[in-house]
Swiss-Prot record:
Location of region: Disordered: 1-44, 223-248
Major site of localization recorded for this protein: nucleus
Pfam families linked to this entry: HALZ, Homeodomain
Domain of life: Eukaryota
Protein name: Homeobox-leucine zipper protein HOX15
PROSITE patterns: HOMEOBOX_1, HOMEOBOX_2
Family assignment from sequence similarity: Belongs to the HD-ZIP homeobox family. Class II subfamily.
SMART domains: HALZ (SM00340), HOX (SM00389)
Alphabetically ordered keywords of this record: DNA-binding, Homeobox, Nucleus, Transcription, Transcription regulation
Species assigned in the record: Oryza sativa subsp. indica
Low complexity bias spans: 32-44
Length: 248
């Protein structure tokens, strides 16, 4: 009796398992790929002790499709933007061809005003049949050329000033060396003149010293001696031109 019950339960379990598996496969085949549906996967692991464990796995198909469409649109937009940038870059790199009248008018306006406000820019662009951006770029380039020319002129002027100052510095250095040599030779000659003995031929008589010596001798001597000294010529007093007397 117990054996019969076990056989019946086993048959029911097998029939239920096979029926669930078949229904799951049919629903999976019938579900469209573009529909947002949840797929249920049933499995009976051996370690669960005979208890069926249901693992639910959600896959949102629409979300995946939307993400794919977003990536595709993004790539398409990036390629179109890159192409537009390339076209704009090519157009911006093209040199602007101006007629003589346009160039003359731009030069006159630049002499009046080196910079333009938006209103002046638009008015000048309409007058020249150009775009405001082209007028702005022309003024920017013209200011850059003017600044470059002024910088070159200033550089040339500074170079000339530097050369002049260098030559003046050399001349002053030569003069300083000459003055130092002259001062050294003069000091050496003066030292030799004061230390060497003076020859007798270079000595001369000091008149004031001679008068003082005569008066002192007359005051201390007798009248006879004074008369004799007066009648007798006195010896000349010699002095050096480098050593002056205090009475002179």
């Amino acid at each position: 009796m117990a054996q019969d019950d076990e056989d019946v339960g086993l048959a029911l379990g097998l029939s239920l398992g096979s029926g669930g598996h078949r229904r799951q496969r049919e629903s999976r085949d019938e579900a469209p790929s573009s529909a947002a549906a949840s797929l249920l996967t049933l499995r009976l692991p051996a370690e669960s002790g005979g208890q069926p464990q249901v693992v639910v796995k959600r896959e949102v198909v629409r979300a995946e499709e939307e993400e794919y469409e977003y990536e595709y649109e993004r790539a398409l937009y990036s390629s179109s933007a890159a192409a537009a940038d390339d076209d704009e870059g090519c157009n911006s790199r093209k040199k602007l061809r101006l007629s003589k009248e346009q160039s003359a008018l731009l030069e006159d306006r630049f002499k009046e005003h080196s910079t333009l406000n938006p209103k002046q820019k638009v008015a000048l662009a309409k007058q020249l049949n150009l775009r405001p951006r082209q007028v702005e770029v022309w003024f920017q380039n013209r200011r850059a050329r003017t600044k470059l020319k002024q910088t070159e002129v200033d550089c040339e002027l500074l170079k000339r000033c530097c050369e002049t100052l260098t030559e003046e510095n050399r001349r002053l250095h030569r003069e300083l060396q000459q003055l130092r040599a002259l001062t050294h030779s003069t000091a050496a000659g003066f030292f030799m003149a004061t230390t060497l003995p003076v020859p007798a031929a270079t000595l001369s008589i000091c008149p004031s010293c001679e008068r003082l010596a005569t008066a002192a001798a007359a005051a201390g001597a007798s009248p006879t001696a004074a008369a004799d000294r007066t009648n007798k010529p006195t010896a000349p007093h010699l002095f050096s031109p480098f050593a002056k007397s205090a009475a002179c």
